[in-house]
Amino acid sequence: MTDRIIVKDLVVFAYHGVHPEEQRLGQRFEVDLSCAMNLREAAKRDTEGATVSYSSLVEIVAEISSRRTFFLIEALADDIARTILSRYAQIDAVTVTVRKPSAPIPATLGYVAVEVTRDRND
């Protein structure tokens, strides 16, 4: 059984996309994280130092989203996943979902999204 830390529906405003107007005007992106790790020690000790801080995960997403412009949300999701794994040895794998609710597509849709999973073997 795998334990997970989950961050759902994090909203960031950023300037990602292949179209010049996306990079100029920016738009909302929604991000979910699911970090697989052993949480037994955190549950037993009941101290913040025994786990990964949720707010630090949120900060990573905000930092990467604002640090540079990505053409593809695939690249954004991959960068978030790899950064989380590089900063937290206790996380075994991470799944990152990036949703783009306002994709410039001539159709009525809720959102487009990508989901990537990275682990220590990637």
Describe each model-derived feature in a short phrase.
Residues 1-122:
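N-terminal, polar/charged subdomain of small-to-medium soluble alpha/beta proteins
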